[in-house]
């Protein structure tokens, strides 16, 4: 990853935020991170846009990771969201993925964070390329139909 990833990080604990930033750096992820601590700041940052990735704690005062995912999906459906949680059970993992999380990482296993970020960014790039190719294919089909119509009209004269 050449240019720094623009990361929106929803985390209320400064110590956890520092550990997560260190894990990204140790994993070779260069980032420009905007850290917010509550729903209002999160919504304001989302509205400004320009982020490549969202990292979100699951449990925050008066706000949670699933609500954060819903806010992201409403405005930026293709923006990857990785939940980073201190505690996670199987039910949480399933619920978060069904809600639209790209991945989840335990705070006790932050060595998984950089690979999860790389995978999420690779999936975004693949999705963008697939959409580009689909648009190209549709355009080619339109041109083929126009060519057939033009040939039919020319034949009639």
Regions found by a protein language model. Name each.
Residues 4-5, 12-29, 43-128:
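N-terminal membrane insertion elements
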Residues 9, 35, 83-85, 139:
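Conserved SAM-binding loop
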Residues 33-40:
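Conserved Asp/Asn-Gly motif in the active-site loop of CheY-like receiver
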Residues 125-142:
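Sensory-domain boundary/capping and coupling elements
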Residues 153-157:
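Hydrophobic face of the DHp
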């Amino acid at each position: 990853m050449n240019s720094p990833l623009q990361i929106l990080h929803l985390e209320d604990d400064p110590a956890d935020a520092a550990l997560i930033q260190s894990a990204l750096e140790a994993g070779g992820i260069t980032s420009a991170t905007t850290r917010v601590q509550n729903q209002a700041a999160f919504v304001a940052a989302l509205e400004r846009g320009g982020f490549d990735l969202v990292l979100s704690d699951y449990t925050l005062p008066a706000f949670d990771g699933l609500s954060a995912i819903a806010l992201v999906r409403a405005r930026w459906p293709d923006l990857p969201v990785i939940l980073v949680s201190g505690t996670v059970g199987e039910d949480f993992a399933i619920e978060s993925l069904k809600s639209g999380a790209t991945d989840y990482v335990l705070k006790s296993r932050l060595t998984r964070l950089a690979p999860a970020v790389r995978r999420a960014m690779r999936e975004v790039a693949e999705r963008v390329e697939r959409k580009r190719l689909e648009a190209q294919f549709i355009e080619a089909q339109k041109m083929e139909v126009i060519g057939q119509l033009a040939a039919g009209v020319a034949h009639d004269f």
